[in-house]
């Protein structure tokens, strides 16, 4: 009787199951109306799928072993894991003087360049002008096992022995307006600009112009001078060195018997506002060769001094060592002028400025059909359709270092206009520092400093 009772109970239970299921469980379509859940990457046979860093370690927390399975490389795994655990300790760039940072868990490690040590590469083993200019803001001079810093004219050495402090409102090489107004846009400006030079015949052409440059805003190129002929037309450029001296190219002096100088202008067409400065004398380097443009340098002495302001400031004159070892090893220089904006066109009414890279001497010499003498250097791009041609000869090639702008070259000559594989050729100012100083010292009026307010 007991076995029969047990069998009846089992049959009764099985008979009731479909009804229970219909009461407890909902159909899939109906259930989805109530249970809204975002699908994850997890699914059937997930462990058999290839590793995915987003699925394993971002959507979910992963282990180091899971990360290793994804990267399949110990070095990559360590680099990822150190950042994954507690963030990137190198994001603040803690390593000084070019040191390389490697992230760790709760720490970082700096690999220092030669001659530097310390957790952040902050200590010099021994001072040398060859390493980061001896930490000098301007000029560095080796003294036994140490270095001695000094500054350009119109600056004094700071109390720290490294920095240079401007002594006047219009100290050389200061470009306050450009730094304040366009600091954020400078990287695009640097990356997007280019200059190469023009050849009109089989000889190097002294006629230079800037093509596709940006407008130089008022006060952004304060050292720019422009040379006008008897008719008041632009034919060359120049660089303000002092209240009465303007640096230019020697071949510019041979182009016109009558020369006037204008400074502080960004729109040369506004004749009612421009003030013409008369030339007293012009000093052309005695070794200048018109056929080759070697020694293409000259200094103009004005009859009346320039009145400095926020928009009119001289460029700083570097030492030869500083120019060769520091300035000309920077990535870019800056040229400016009122030259033509297209081949065969008219000179520009507005001042244009272009940032161009230095070109190594070997590449420079290979690119030219003419001799590149030791008194010349190349700058510019070899392919981009941006150029420097007629009208800007004699103008400035400026290089900035620690917010001070130094004259490094004079726009001289070139081959082709936006011609592939050709660069602009510039007079190398560092070769002529003693000559420039000698001319200025020999002919300097006693009233220059007070009138020019250096």
Swiss-Prot record:
Record-annotated Gla domain positions: 41-86
Similarity remark: Belongs to the peptidase S1 family. Snake venom subfamily.
Post-translational modification: The vitamin K-dependent, enzymatic carboxylation of some glutamate residues allows the modified protein to bind calcium.
4-carboxyglutamate sites (modified residues): 46-47, 54, 56, 59-60, 65-66, 69, 75
Annotated organism of origin: Pseudechis porphyriacus (Red-bellied black snake)
GO BP terms: blood coagulation; induction of blood coagulation in another organism; proteolysis; venom-mediated blood coagulation
Subunit structure: Heterodimer of a light chain and a heavy chain; disulfide-linked.
Signal peptide per UniProt: 1-20
Enzyme class, first EC level, given as a word: hydrolase
Protein's name according to its UniProt entry: Venom prothrombin activator porpharin-D
Keyword Glycoprotein: yes
The reaction(s) this protein catalyses: Selective cleavage of Arg-|-Thr and then Arg-|-Ile bonds in prothrombin to form thrombin
Transcription keyword on record: no
GO MF annotation: an example: toxin activity
């Amino acid at each position: 009787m007991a076995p029969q009772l047990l069998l009846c109970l089992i049959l009764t239970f099985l008979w009731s199951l479909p009804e229970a299921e219909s009461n407890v469980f909902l159909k899939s379509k109906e259930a989805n109306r109530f249970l809204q859940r975002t699908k994850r990457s997890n699914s059937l046979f997930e462990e058999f799928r290839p590793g995915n860093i987003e699925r394993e370690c971002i959507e979910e927390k992963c282990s180091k072993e899971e990360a290793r399975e994804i990267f399949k490389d110990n070095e990559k795994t360590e680099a990822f894991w150190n950042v994954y655990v507690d963030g990137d300790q190198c994001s603040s760039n803690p390593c000084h003087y070019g040191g390389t940072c490697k992230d760790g868990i709760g720490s970082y490690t700096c690999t220092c360049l030669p001659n530097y040590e310390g957790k952040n590469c902050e200590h010099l083993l021994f001072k040398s002008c060859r390493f980061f200019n001896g930490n000098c803001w301007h000029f560095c001079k080796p003294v036994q096992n140490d270095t001695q810093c000094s500054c350009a004219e119109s600056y004094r050495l700071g109390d720290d022995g490294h920095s240079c402090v401007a002594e006047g409102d219009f100290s050389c090489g200061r470009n306050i307006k450009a730094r304040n107004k366009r600091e954020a846009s400078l990287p695009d400006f640097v990356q997007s600009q280019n200059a190469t030079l023009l050849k009109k015949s089989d000889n190097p052409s002294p006629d230079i112009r800037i093509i596709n440059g940006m407008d130089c805003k008022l006060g952004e190129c304060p050292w720019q001078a422009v040379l006008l002929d008897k008719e008041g037309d632009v034919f060359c450029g120049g660089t303000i060195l002092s209240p009465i001296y303007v640096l230019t190219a020697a071949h510019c002096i041979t182009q016109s018997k009558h020369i006037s100088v204008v400074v502080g202008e960004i729109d040369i067409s506004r004749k009612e506002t421009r003030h013409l400065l008369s030339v007293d004398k012009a000093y052309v380097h005695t070794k200048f060769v018109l056929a080759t443009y070697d020694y293409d340098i000259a200094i103009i002495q004005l009859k009346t001094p320039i009145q400095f302001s926020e928009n009119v400031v001289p460029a700083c004159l570097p030492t030869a060592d500083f120019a060769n070892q520091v300035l000309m090893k920077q990535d870019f220089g800056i040229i400016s002028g009122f030259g033509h904006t297209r081949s065969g066109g008219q000179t520009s009414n507005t001042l244009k400025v272009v940032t161009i890279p230095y070109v190594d001497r070997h590449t420079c010499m290979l690119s030219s059909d003419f001799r590149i003498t030791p008194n010349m250097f190349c700058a510019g791009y070899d392919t981009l359709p941006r150029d420097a041609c007629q009208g800007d000869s004699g103008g400035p090639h400026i290089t900035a270092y620690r917010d001070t702008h130094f004259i490094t070259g004079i726009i001289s000559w070139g081959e082709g206009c936006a011609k592939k594989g050709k660069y602009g050729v510039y007079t190398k100012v560092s070769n002529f520092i003693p000559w420039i100083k000698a001319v200025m010292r020999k002919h300097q009026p006693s009233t220059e400093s007070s009138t020019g307010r250096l």
